[in-house]
């Protein structure tokens, strides 16, 4: 093997839901170059979402070549590749031709809803939760895979004969990059399939039987940081993690009680629970994360449905702001929300309420309420919902939140970050490096090949750009939060449905 000292770069491949990206990092974990290409979204029916796996591979290969060319680098200068990916998205391909037998079924796709309903009717819901840490929902790969095997003629038989392979996007990319030599996944991606026992760390025989999935088609499961194989040009592939777990690692949340929140359209919260697979009483997912060396650790995961989308609503539907960045200015013009609470339950409420029948509402309106107050209430709602999830995680895990690391587009909003710290009563840490997902994949690959020697070396590179300290006293904080809880309670069970009074 060429001396690692002569190779001064790591490439992170960030395969997302709408685009494929390549980010080149140097030894100081600085971004040298980025390349990105979008690809086609296919919507064959209402609620169905597909991608073409060949287009995903083509765009991901192209951006890697593009990034190297832009940076003026040769592949010999790259120590390793780390891969992070949209999770749960499901691909089945022919082992000989390397061609998919059907489009990739994307994590957002709801076509396997009826399969999930049948699993519930058959009494499997508790077993699924106990074994896989997941809820019975079309979100996860298992029912998507069953749908393909049920609907593509002869596919189940071919899979039993060892002719077909299954993988999440990481597996598919590695298979293609290694020229069909390597069929692997990592523990974080396996834990999102609904086929994997997160306690024994093996594919679960009963789940395979329930969903009628042939064992022969499944990838080998490995840690998130080791050398899995090499590309045709000889670059080692050394790190794999699902996107949210990669962000958790990129934020250096590797010890129990450390948590990160990604503020996007919704919010993704993950809290590391160390070597304990904590069972949630609040509908959180129990999932696998990356330990200090990329080994198995556990995490609780919760999602807020409407984060940045609440601000988009102010802009696109209400038209009271021209740009999302304006919200910080308007929110700062008033000293508080004047008693206004906005509960953005546009599509129901997620964790910890899980009420699909809740609907959005604006409370506390008086003649003294101005547009500024409503804009401020919209930003505050993102912070309140984050506290809802983090409070539940702390109750489930018994871990006290040390500090909240943040990433995603909305973290540039200083008002939101300060209010988040205030309402949590906990320090919020905003990193200088915003590419935390790609950085996590780069770290995992770098540790695997000796590019970086230890976690301590990486910690030294994690620069916090700004710390937001809580400034509200306990009484004021809890009074505000009690108002939020009251507002949420009034939105519950709004939409008429069977079983409602």
Swiss-Prot record:
Regulation of activity: Inhibited by fructose 1,6-bisphosphate (FBP).
Question: What's a Pfam family in this record?
Answer: FGGY_C
Where, in this chain's numbering, is sn-glycerol 3-phosphate bound?
Answer: 17, 87-88, 139, 243
InterPro entries reported for this sequence? ATPase_NBD, Carb_kinase_FGGY, Carb_kinase_FGGY_CS, FGGY_C, FGGY_N, Glycerol_kin
Name by which UniProt lists this protein: Glycerol kinase
Which pathway does it serve?
Polyol metabolism; glycerol degradation via glycerol kinase pathway; sn-glycerol 3-phosphate from glycerol: step 1/1
What would be one Gene Ontology cellular-component term for the protein? cytosol
Function of the protein: Key enzyme in the regulation of glycerol uptake and metabolism. Catalyzes the phosphorylation of glycerol to yield sn-glycerol 3-phosphate.
Q: What does UniProt list as this organism's lineage?
A: Bacteria, Pseudomonadati, Pseudomonadota, Gammaproteobacteria, Pseudomonadales
Organism of origin is Pseudomonas fluorescens (strain SBW25)
Q: Which reaction does this chain catalyze?
A: glycerol + ATP = sn-glycerol 3-phosphate + ADP + H(+)
Q: Which UniProt keywords apply?
A: ATP-binding, Glycerol metabolism, Kinase, Nucleotide-binding, Transferase
**Which family, according to UniProt?**
Belongs to the FGGY kinase family.
Residues annotated for ATP binding in this entry: 17-19, 265, 308, 312, 409
Q: Can you tell me which residues bind glycerol? A: 87-88, 139, 243-244
Q: Which GO terms describe its molecular function?
A: ATP binding; glycerol kinase activity
| Enzyme Commission code | 2.7.1.30
| An example Gene Ontology biological process | glycerol catabolic process
Chain residues that bind ADP: 17, 21, 265, 308, 409, 413
Q: Which Gene3D superfamilies match?
A: 3.30.420.40
Q: What class of enzyme is it?
A: transferase
């Amino acid at each position: 093997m060429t001396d690692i000292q002569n190779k001064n770069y790591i490439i992170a491949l960030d395969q997302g839901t709408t685009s494929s990206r390549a980010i080149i990092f140097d030894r100081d974990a600085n971004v040298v170059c980025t390349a990105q290409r979008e690809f086609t979204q296919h919507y064959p029916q209402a609620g169905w979402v597909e991608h073409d796996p060949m287009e995903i591979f083509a765009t991901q290969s192209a951006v890697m070549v593009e990034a190297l060319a832009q940076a003026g680098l040769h592949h010999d200068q790259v120590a390793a590749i780390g891969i992070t990916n949209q999770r749960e998205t499901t691909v089945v391909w022919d082992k000989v031709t390397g061609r998919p037998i059907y489009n990739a079924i994307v994590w957002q796709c709801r076509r396997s809803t009826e399969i999930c309903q049948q699993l519930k009717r058959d009494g499997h819901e508790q077993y699924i939760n106990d074994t896989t840490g997941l809820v019975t929902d079309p979100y996860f790969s298992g029912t998507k895979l069953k749908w393909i095997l049920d609907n593509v003629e002869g596919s189940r038989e071919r899979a039993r004969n060892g002719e077909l392979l299954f993988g999440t996007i990481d597996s598919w990319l590695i298979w293609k990059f290694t020229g069909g030599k390597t069929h692997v996944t990592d523990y974080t991606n396996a834990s999102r399939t609904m086929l994997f026992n997160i306690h024994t760390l093996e594919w679960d025989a009963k789940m395979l039987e329930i969903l009628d999935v042939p064992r022969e088609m499944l990838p080998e499961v490995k840690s998130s940081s080791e050398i899995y194989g090499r590309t045709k040009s000889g670059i080692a592939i050394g790190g794999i993690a699902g996107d949210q777990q990669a962000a958790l690692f990129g934020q250096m949340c590797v010890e129990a009680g450390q948590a990160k929140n990604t503020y996007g359209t919704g919010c993704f919260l993950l809290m590391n629970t160390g070597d304990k697979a904590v069972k949630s009483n609040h509908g959180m997912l129990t999932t696998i994360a990356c330990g200090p060396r990329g080994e198995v650790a556990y995490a609780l995961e919760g999602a807020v449905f409407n984060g940045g989308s609440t601000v988009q609503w102010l802009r696109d539907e209400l038209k009271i702001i021209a740009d999302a960045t304006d919200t910080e200015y308007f929110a700062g013009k008033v000293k508080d929300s004047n008693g206004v609470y906005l509960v953005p339950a546009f599509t129901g409420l997620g964790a910890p309420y899980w009420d699909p029948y809740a609907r959005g509402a604006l409370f506390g309106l008086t003649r003294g309420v101005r547009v500024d107050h409503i804009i401020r209430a919209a930003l505050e709602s993102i912070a309140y919902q984050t506290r809802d999830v983090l409070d539940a995680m702390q109750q489930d895990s018994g871990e006290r939140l040390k500090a909240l690391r943040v990433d995603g587009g909305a973290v540039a909003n200083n008002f939101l970050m300060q209010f988040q710290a205030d309402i949590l009563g906990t320090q919020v840490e905003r990193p200088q490096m915003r590419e935390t997902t790609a950085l996590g994949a780069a770290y995992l690959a770098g540790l695997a090949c000796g590019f970086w020697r230890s976690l301590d070396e990486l910690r030294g590179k994690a620069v916090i750009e700004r710390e937001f300290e809580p400034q509200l006293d306990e009484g004021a904080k809890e009074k505000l939060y009690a108002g939020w809880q009251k507002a949420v309670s009034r939105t519950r069970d709004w939409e008429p449905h069977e079983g409602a009074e």
